[in-house]
Amino acid sequence: SDCLLKPVAIYPDPVRKDGWIVMNEVLNSDGSPHESNGRATIDDDDDDFWFGFEQEYFLWDPETNLPLGFPKDQTPQGQFYCSVGGKNAFGREIMDRHLDICIDAGINIEGTNAEVAAGQWEFQIFAKGAAKAGDEIWVARYFLERLAEEYGLAIEYHPKPLGATDWNGSGMHANFSNTTLRTCGSKETYEAICEAFRPVVNEHIAVYGAYNDQRLTGDHETQSITEFSYGVSDRGASIR
């Protein structure tokens, strides 16, 4: 049952004096990658691969088992997106503090915004190279979870924490490019790449996390999990 930890990245911990956060890979006792170690599966990593992750999440109140600020009068979602004001934005202090912590830790956090549902927020991470991108999103999540403890809150990443209701779920949109995509300026090339996903889309969905069938319904700015599409500025497409 013993496992080994292999340090792979280190970040200063802005919250603790002279502290550091060390990202590790988990190895079996014989040195082989543990089954949970997805990082070890990355091969041919290259700084030419650019990733932009948009991580959505809910600030979750354990006492009510609902999002922070969830309306008691069942006010429908809509007014909370990119909102301001005490009737609309709940938990901005946490979001702002998380932004500062990530910046001070050297994580390339690109932005934040209030999301569609009450108590729902998003932060964005950019990195060059798959391993670095994964390291930064995981460490940013860790900082967020630890920060929420100070407020007696949890961070909820479930794709559809409010179930089959008229409230958005959470995902993590992944923006990707390489030199070809950034420089070709060819609609035909973009469409050919998107089409290459069509026969293997189920293989991708299988490793994108649990419960995505609850979120990918075709509603709330999603494509159905059983369909595949792409389009320019199409928020209901599989690939936008």
Question: Where do the protein language model's features map onto the residues?
Answer:
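Glycine-rich, acidic/polar active-site loops that bind/position phosphate-bearing ligands
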Residues: S1-R240
